[in-house]
Amino acid sequence: MELVLNRNVSACKGKRYTEGQLSVNGKYLCDTLEPQWRNISSLHPGKKVKGRTAIPAGRYAVTITYSPKFGRWLPLLLHVPLFTGIRIHEGNTVEDTAGCILLGKKSNEGVLCYSRCWMRRFMELLDARPEGEPIWITVR
C-alpha cells in the first residue's frame, strides 16, 4: 500500500503548522496537519524543536502497533531520521500533533475537523489491504 503526503510548505511558511493532503494508492483521502516545517536533516539537527517540527521529506515504512499513549492500534512511521514515535492519528490543531501527522478535513487555517471520522476511514483502508502487504508513505 502506497501513501503519499503532499505538503503545502510554501503556503504555511512562517506559521506554526504545515498543511497537506494524504493520498492512498493514488487517490486523495483527506487533509493533514503537522507541526511547523523546518529545513532539517542529519546535517542540520540543531533546527529541530521536539514535538514542534514536521518530519523530513522522504519515504518511510509504516507498521501498525499498539500505542499505550492512545490505547489503541495506530500507524507508526519507521526509521525517520532524527525522530522516534511518529504516528498518524486524529486531532484538530497543531497542539494535538506532538510531532505526528493528523488526519481530517481542513476547516480553517491550521484547523482540521471530522478527524475521528477520517482516521476511522483510514484505518479501515489499512485493515482491508491484503495480508502481509507492506505500507509505505512518501512525504513530499
Residue ranges of each PLM-predicted region?
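Cell wall/extracellular polymer interaction/catalysis modules
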Residues: 1-135
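Divalent-metal-activated hydrolytic enzyme cores
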Residues: 136-140
